[in-house]
Amino acid sequence: MMDSPKIGNGLPVIGPGTDIGISSLHMVGYLGKNFDSAKVPSDEYCPACREKGKLKALKTYRISFQESIFLCEDLQCIYPLGSKSLNNLISPDLEECHTPHKPQKRKSLESSYKDSLLLANSKKTRNYIAIDGGKVLNSKHNGEVYDETSSNLPDSSGQQNPIRTADSLERNEILEADTVDMATTKDPATVDVSGTGRPSPQNEGCTSKLEMPLESKCTSFPQALCVQWKNAYALCWLDCILSALVHSEELKNTVTGLCSKEESIFWRLLTKYNQANTLLYTSQLSGVKDGDCKKLTSEIFAEIETCLNEVRDEIFISLQPQLRCTLGDMESPVFAFPLLLKLETHIEKLFLYSFSWDFECSQCGHQYQNRHMKSLVTFTNVIPEWHPLNAAHFGPCNNCNSKSQIRKMVLEKVSPIFMLHFVEGLPQNDLQHYAFHFEGCLYQITSVIQYRANNHFITWILDADGSWLECDDLKGPCSERHKKFEVPASEIHIVIWERKISQVTDKEAACLPLKKTNDQHALSNEKPVSLTSCSVGDAASAETASVTHPKDISVAPRTLSQDTAVTHGDHLLSGPKGLVDNILPLTLEETIQKTASVSQLNSEAFLLENKPVAENTGILKTNTLLSQESLMASSVSAPCNEKLIQDQFVDISFPSQVVNTNMQSVQLNTEDTVNTKSVNNTDATGLIQGVKSVEIEKDAQLKQFLTPKTEQLKPERVTSQVSNLKKKETTADSQTTTSKSLQNQSLKENQKKPFVGSWVKGLISRGASFMPLCVSAHNRNTITDLQPSVKGVNNFGGFKTKGINQKASHVSKKARKSASKPPPISKPPAGPPSSNGTAAHPHAHAASEVLEKSGSTSCGAQLNHSSYGNGISSANHEDLVEGQIHKLRLKLRKKLKAEKKKLAALMSSPQSRTVRSENLEQVPQDGSPNDCESIEDLLNELPYPIDIASESACTTVPGVSLYSSQTHEEILAELLSPTPVSTELSENGEGDFRYLGMGDSHIPPPVPSEFNDVSQNTHLRQDHNYCSPTKKNPCEVQPDSLTNNACVRTLNLESPMKTDIFDEFFSSSALNALANDTLDLPHFDEYLFENY
C-alpha cells in the first residue's frame, strides 16, 4: 500500500491528492483540506447531484486524527449537510487511523498485536484472519496451524507468538499486518474471487488468506461482487432492464444456444457484462498482489464502466426509433422492456404468454372474454388476495360505468419468463407467497424492478443462496447484497417469474410448456399430472423406449384415463425418480387429442415403460376391453358415420405399409415392463391395397376384440381399414356381418342405427326365414345405391353397359373372395344341380366369418391377399362376359313376354274373375311343364360368373338368424312402404304374379300348420332354386318395376298366408297409415325399393 505524502512531522500534506483522476478541490471551510485519496467509499458519487443529472464525487475530509466526513466536491452542493444529523455524519475513524506509526520496541508491538487478536475474535466467531496472519508470518518456520472454523483461540502462553518469528520482516510490514487485523472485524468469512458466485477455496495456501483482507481493505467490496451500470443521462430506466436481463438464467441458456450469436444484441449484452465481471475479478487479485489499490479503484473501474456503456449505448440506439427516447429524458421500463424484446423474435418468445381477460358485470350483466398474447401485462387496483392463479383486479364496466367490478386474467400458456406490471404495487412484499405451479413447472420470482417516488428504478435480483442483489445505478459500480428483500409492497413495479424445473430432465422440460391448461391440473391443486398430456414430439424422445414401434403406427394416448394412469404410482413430480426414471415416452399427435374415441383403435399405444401405469395388469386389460367395446359398437354404424371416422383418421394415420398382418402383442410381466414382439408378420405385398377387402379386415379386427381374459393383448392395425371405407355396399355387408358376432349387444346396436332405411335391415335380420332371398338382396342393393333410378323400361339400367365395369369388378372381386374361403362348417341341404354353385357361396361366406371370429389371423391375411389378386383378374375378364350376359337377358325377356300373353288370355276367362282366391291357388298348376322346362333351360345357359356375381350382390345376410319367431303379419307391416311402386299395382302386375308361380307347378302348396323350421328351410331352398335367375338381380331381369314387386308378392303365396292379408296390407289405407307414421319411418328414402 502506498501511503499519502507526509511531511517531516508525520502529518499528511494539506491539500488535494495527486492521484490520477482526482479533481482539485477548493477550500472547504473550517473543516480543512486534509484529503485522503485512499478513503473513497463504494458510492463515490454524490446522490443529491446524481438526482439532478450531475456526477459529482464524494471526498473524505478529516476533521481530526480520529474523525472524518464525506462531502460533495461541488461547491453548490451541501450534501450531506441537512440530510442527516451531524452526529451521524461525522464517523469515528476506528478501523483505519492513519496516525503515523513511529518505530516501537518489539515488546510493545507484541502486546498491541495480542490485544487486537482478542478484540477481533470477540466480535466474530468465525474470524480466522488473526490466526491466518500468524500463519503467514510463521509460514517459513512451521508454525502451528489452526482450523479456521474453530471459535476457540489458543492461549498466548501455549502458542508460539507469530511476531517473535518475524524478526526478518521490516517494520512497515508488521504495521501493515497489524492494520489488516484491525480492519477485518467486518470482513466476511469467504470472498468470491472466481467470478462464479462460489467462495474461493480455503486451503489453497497461506498467502491467499492474507490477500483477502487486503483486497477487502483496498476495494471495500461486499461478498459475491457483481458489476452494474452507472447512472448517466437519467438512464436508470434502461439500466434496471439490463440488470434484470443479464441475471436471467433462462435468457442465458437461450442465447447460448443461438446459431448466429454475433448478430444477437442480447448475446453482445451478456458478453460485455461477463467481460466487465472478469475484468473486476482479475484486477482485484492483480491489484492486491501488486499492492496498488489505487489502480484498482480508479483505472479498472473506468475500464469496466466503458465496457458496460458500450453495450448500453448500442441498445439505446436500437430502441430509439420505436421508443423515441432522448438522452436525459426519463422513460419507463414498462414501455421499453417489450420494445427491447421485439428486437429479436426468438428472445421475445421466452416472455410471450397467452391469457384471457374474463369480465362479468354484477350490475348490468355485461360480460366478455378477450384472449391476448403479451410479454408484459399491467395490473391496477389488484384485489387483496391477488395471486398469479387468481389474477383479478377492480375496474369499471364499459357498459354501465359501474366501478369496482372484477376482471380476472386466466392463464392459458405461460412462457419460461413471466412478467407483470403493477401500478400500485402488490398487496404484500412476501414474494414466496406469489410462487405458483403451472403445467408441472414451478414459477418463482427472481427479479423485481422497484419504482421510487422520485422517478428512480432499481432492480433486485434473487441470488442462488437466497440473498438479494440491489442493482442501483446510483450506488457505484457494484451491486449491494441484502439478506432480505427490502422493498415496500407499494414500490414493487415489475415482477419477473422464471420457470424452475429441477426434477425433470431437459427432454421432458422441452415438452412441458407445450401442454394445454385443460389437459392436466396445476400442481398447486395437489393433483397428479397425467402422463398422456405430455407430448414428446421429436423422434429423439422415442429412443428411451425399450422397443421401437413401426413408424406408421399412431400411438393412442387416451386408452388409460388420467385417474387410472396415476392410481398405481407415486406423484410424477414428487422426486427425480417419479418422472425421470419412469417417464412414458409416447409419440402423440395433435389430432389424436381431438379424436380420442377414434384413436382407441390403435392399440399399439401400449409401449409402456413406467411403473405407475403398468403396475396393474387388470386395469390395463379392463381399459383396453372398454375401448374395444366402444369400437365394436361404432363399427355397426351408418356409412355417413364411417365417412366421418374416415375423415378423422386421415389426419392421424400414416401411409399404410402394414395393413392387417403386422400385429404386436403387449405382454405385461411381473417386473412392470412391457415386451413387444411380433405375433404374425406375413409377407404379403398385396396387402397394401387394403381397399380390396375392407370387410375382411373388419372381421379380423373384431375377432381380436372378442378374445378377452388372455395373457396377451393382441392389438391390430386398423388404420388402413378405416381409411379405405369407400364403397357403401361393402360397408353395409360388413356391418351386418358384425352384428352377428355381437349377439350380446344386439339391442344396443339396433338402437344406434342412424342411417336411412336401417329399419329394413332390422326387419330382414328378424324375418329372413319368411322373406325370399331375392327380396332381401334387393333391399340391400337399393340401400347402398347412391343415385336415384330413372323410371321406364327403355331407360332401365339392367339392359345398359353404363357403369358395368365398376359394378362387375366389384362383384367379381367379392366372388373370388368368397370362393377362396375355407370349406363351410355347416350348411343347409343343397338345392338342384342347376344352382349348386350359387347356393354354396353364401354359406361359405358365413363359414369364413365363423373362422375369423374364432381367431384365424392367417386366414384373414390370405383372404385379403387373394382378394387383391382376383380383383385385377376379374377386371380383365369383364369384357368377355359382358356381351353374353346382354344376349341371354334379351332372350329371357322375349320368352317372358310370350308367356305374359298366355297369362292375359287366362285372365280374360270369367272363372278367374269370379273366384279370385281359387285362381290364385290353382294358377301354379295351370302352367304346362314344357313352359317351365323352357325357362329353366334358358336359365341354365347363364354362365357361372353371372350366377356368382348375382349371388355375391344379392345373397342374404349370413350373420342373421335363419329361423325367427316373428309372424308374417309383422314382417309385412314393416316391409310395406309408401313408395310409388307399391301404390301403383295393376291387373297386369297381378297377372305377372300368377305367371311367376308357374315355375313351381310341381311343388304342392305347404300346409299352414306345418310352419316350422324344416318347412321354412325347404321353402327357402326351393325358392332359391327357381328364382336364382331372378335373384341374380331383379332389377336387371324384370321388364319393369311392377313385375319386380309382383315377384315379391307371388313368392309369398307359397306360405300359408291368405290372400285377404295381402289385400289388407296392399290397400291404400294401410299404405297411407304407414306413410304418416313418422316414428317408424323418420328418414325413409322414396327410392329405397326402386330399380335402375
Curated annotation (Swiss-Prot):
<dbReference type="InterPro" id="IPR028890">
    <property type="entry name" value="Peptidase_C98"/>
</dbReference>
<feature type="modified residue" description="Phosphoserine">
    <location>
        <position position="909"/>
    </location>
</feature>
<dbReference type="GO" id="GO:0030576">
    <property type="term" value="P:Cajal body organization"/>
</dbReference>
<dbReference type="GO" id="GO:0015030">
    <property type="term" value="C:Cajal body"/>
</dbReference>
<dbReference type="GO" id="GO:0009301">
    <property type="term" value="P:snRNA transcription"/>
</dbReference>
<keyword id="KW-0645">Protease</keyword>
<feature type="region of interest" description="Disordered">
    <location>
        <begin position="145"/>
        <end position="168"/>
    </location>
</feature>
<comment type="similarity">
    <text>Belongs to the peptidase C19 family.</text>
</comment>
<dbReference type="GO" id="GO:0008283">
    <property type="term" value="P:cell population proliferation"/>
</dbReference>
<dbReference type="GO" id="GO:0016929">
    <property type="term" value="F:deSUMOylase activity"/>
</dbReference>
<feature type="domain" description="USP">
    <location>
        <begin position="227"/>
        <end position="500"/>
    </location>
</feature>
<comment type="function">
    <text>SUMO-specific isopeptidase involved in protein desumoylation. Specifically binds SUMO proteins with a higher affinity for SUMO2 and SUMO3 which it cleaves more efficiently. Also able to process full-length SUMO proteins to their mature forms. Plays a key role in RNA polymerase-II-mediated snRNA transcription in the Cajal bodies. Is a component of complexes that can bind to U snRNA genes.</text>
</comment>
<feature type="region of interest" description="Disordered">
    <location>
        <begin position="797"/>
        <end position="859"/>
    </location>
</feature>
<feature type="compositionally biased region" description="Basic residues">
    <location>
        <begin position="810"/>
        <end position="819"/>
    </location>
</feature>
<dbReference type="GO" id="GO:0016926">
    <property type="term" value="P:protein desumoylation"/>
</dbReference>
<feature type="compositionally biased region" description="Polar residues">
    <location>
        <begin position="148"/>
        <end position="163"/>
    </location>
</feature>
<dbReference type="Pfam" id="PF15509">
    <property type="entry name" value="DUF4650"/>
</dbReference>
<feature type="region of interest" description="Disordered">
    <location>
        <begin position="904"/>
        <end position="930"/>
    </location>
</feature>
<dbReference type="GO" id="GO:0032183">
    <property type="term" value="F:SUMO binding"/>
</dbReference>
<feature type="region of interest" description="Disordered">
    <location>
        <begin position="713"/>
        <end position="749"/>
    </location>
</feature>
<keyword id="KW-0539">Nucleus</keyword>
<keyword id="KW-0788">Thiol protease</keyword>
<dbReference type="GO" id="GO:0006508">
    <property type="term" value="P:proteolysis"/>
</dbReference>
<feature type="compositionally biased region" description="Polar residues">
    <location>
        <begin position="732"/>
        <end position="748"/>
    </location>
</feature>
<feature type="region of interest" description="SUMO-binding">
    <location>
        <begin position="236"/>
        <end position="495"/>
    </location>
</feature>
<feature type="active site" description="Nucleophile">
    <location>
        <position position="236"/>
    </location>
</feature>
<comment type="subunit">
    <text>Interacts with ELL.</text>
</comment>
<protein>
    <recommendedName>
        <fullName>SUMO-specific isopeptidase USPL1</fullName>
        <ecNumber>3.4.22.-</ecNumber>
    </recommendedName>
</protein>
<feature type="compositionally biased region" description="Pro residues">
    <location>
        <begin position="821"/>
        <end position="832"/>
    </location>
</feature>
<feature type="active site" description="Proton acceptor">
    <location>
        <position position="456"/>
    </location>
</feature>
<keyword id="KW-0378">Hydrolase</keyword>
<dbReference type="InterPro" id="IPR033505">
    <property type="entry name" value="USPL1"/>
</dbReference>
<feature type="compositionally biased region" description="Polar residues">
    <location>
        <begin position="197"/>
        <end position="206"/>
    </location>
</feature>
<dbReference type="InterPro" id="IPR028889">
    <property type="entry name" value="USP_dom"/>
</dbReference>
<feature type="region of interest" description="Disordered">
    <location>
        <begin position="185"/>
        <end position="207"/>
    </location>
</feature>
<dbReference type="InterPro" id="IPR029388">
    <property type="entry name" value="DUF4650"/>
</dbReference>
<dbReference type="Pfam" id="PF15499">
    <property type="entry name" value="Peptidase_C98"/>
</dbReference>
<dbReference type="GO" id="GO:0005615">
    <property type="term" value="C:extracellular space"/>
</dbReference>
<dbReference type="InterPro" id="IPR038765">
    <property type="entry name" value="Papain-like_cys_pep_sf"/>
</dbReference>
<keyword id="KW-0597">Phosphoprotein</keyword>
